[in-house]
Amino acid sequence: MNSNIFPPSKQQNELNNIQQSFSNLQSQCSNLLLNVSQTLNPLFNANTNNNKPNIFSALNSFRDQAKQALDSRISRFNSGKAPVWARISDDGGGARAQVTVPIRGSGKGLSADAIEERLAGVPVYALSNSNEEFVLVSGTSSGKSLGLLFCKEEDAETLLKEMKSMDPRMRKEGSKVVALALSKVFQLKVNGVAFRLIPESTQVKNALKERKTAGIDDDDFHGVPVFQSKSLILRSENMSYRPVFFRKEDLEKSLIRASSQQNRLNPALKPGDIQVAVFEDIVKGMRESTTSNWDDIVFIPPGFEVSTEQTQE
């Protein structure tokens, strides 16, 4: 795996400014993977038909979702120069829509393949030109290049619109937003480029709110927030594992669903039912941990709930 993808760097301040630019975007509800739910693990509950479309074709259909304008322009990046493009090595990898049953008792960190399989059903969004090269942004202060991967498609669309307004040449190059599986992030290999995930601003706010409830008062959140609950444990084929959500709302709906399935009349959440973690830290723990702390984690794509009913494939 490319160690240049997730670790913190000196460019964190620039990323924080990017996140701040998106903080005023209005929240918009969307089921990002509705058209590919039939290809996902049966634990996911989304209403759909019996078709099983190719995951890339289905993800690409989300490009037509509504665009929103930035309230503040991203002024920290050069607008006088043509955008930098970088080709990403595929290494033969493809998008796979599935959730892997946890591997227990290995006594060491999970393999790259095992981690990639758990992320295969989670989409991220990037800016690309007609040659399938991804746009890089350069900070005026550092001069270094960043490849941005967005957790929310609308955020990628608004950045594309902003960059096109600053440099009309991008329109001639066929620049667009493309979707790829988060597992593909681990295959990105571009020398001298650091790839960073940009979280949804609403989920950053949710994470800060939950941390404040837990007694942690902080105005900043570094990384992509993910949400889990000790009250939600899934079981499949005599194994138990913990679902981790990229959206707090999906976790809350899953907790309510679990309460209903367990015939609890009052599914109201108690303080402390929701815990916040950093996605990048979990992935690092999966790679490096010598214990089984992370081998029961399953990542749930945005827009999906989970069922506590035992499921067998």
From Swiss-Prot:
Organelle transit peptide: 1-96
Compartments, as annotated in UniProt: Plastid, Chloroplast intermembrane space
Membrane topology according to the record: Peripheral membrane protein
Any Pfam family: Tic22
Record InterPro entries: Tic22-like (IPR007378)
Domain of life from the UniProt record: Eukaryota
Keywords, alphabetical: Chloroplast, Membrane, Plastid, Protein transport, Transit peptide, Transport
Chief site of localization: plastid
GO biological process, one term: protein transport
Cellular component aspect of the GO annotation: chloroplast intermembrane space; cytosol; membrane; plastid
Function: Involved in protein precursor import into chloroplasts.
Protein family according to the UniProt entry: Belongs to the Tic22 family.
Record-given protein name: Protein TIC 22-like, chloroplastic
